[in-house]
Structures are given as C-alpha cells and as structure tokens.
C-alpha cells in the first residue's frame, strides 16, 4: 500500500479507569477501504476506493447567526476531475445539515470533504 493511515495512540490511567486517545498524525491519509475522515482531499483509487459512502452529517452542532444557519453547521463534499482540487474541475457537489451519501465513481480523480463526520463505505 503506497500510503497508510498513520495513527498515534496514547493511553493513561485516571482514577482507576483506562483512557485512550487516538489521533491522526499530520498529513495522514485513509487507506483505500471502508472509512475515511470527514475533512480533507482524497485521491480516488489511491487514498479511497470508488464506491458509495455515507456520513451522519456535520461534525459541528447547529449554529445560528442572526437567525441563519452558519456554514459551520453544514457538511459538504465535492468530486473533481483532476487531483488538484479547484472550482474549475468540480464534477459534482452537495451540502447538507443532516446525514447524506455520495457515489464516488472511478472516473473522478479526487474527493474533497469539509466539516463532516466519518465517511463509511456502504457499497
């Protein structure tokens, strides 16, 4: 595997209870497979496999600013025709305040996601 998911784990004992924290190391990428983080740019076929994925929605709670929903309360994704993600090469995009799914075809080069919970492969 060209790239692997780098994890840094630490464990401690607090008041007789075991506690563990797992964080992604800087620059970590998800392995091609079942799940990947809700923020980042992922190369299709290298970092993630084509398929159908689902997220439970935004990673932030509902935030209202002067009675309007803040962008911080939305989960968004876009697929791109080139690995260099830009507005000029967007193939498809969506934004939601709730759960959503996406079909990532093998014909796109990159998938960008922002402010979403973990993406899980469903098919």
From Swiss-Prot:
Signal peptide start and end residues: 1-20
Keyword Signal in record: yes
GO annotations of cellular component type: extracellular region
Keyword annotations from UniProtKB, A to Z: Signal
Top-level taxon of origin: Bacteria
This protein's name: Uncharacterized protein Rv1352
């Amino acid at each position: 595997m060209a790239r692997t998911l780098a994890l840094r784990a630490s464990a401690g004992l607090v008041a007789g209870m075991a506690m563990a924290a797992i964080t992604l190391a800087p620059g970590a990428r998800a392995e091609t497979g079942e799940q990947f983080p809700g923020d980042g740019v992922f190369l299709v076929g290298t970092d993630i496999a084509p398929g159908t994925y689902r997220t439970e929605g935004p990673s932030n709670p509902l935030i209202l600013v002067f009675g309007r929903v803040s962008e911080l309360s939305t989960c968004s994704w876009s697929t791109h025709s080139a690995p260099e993600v830009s507005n000029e090469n967007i193939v498809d995009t969506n934004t939601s305040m709730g759960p959503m799914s996406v079909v990532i075809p093998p014909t796109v080069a990159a998938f960008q996601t922002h402010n979403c919970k973990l993406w899980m492969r469903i098919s």
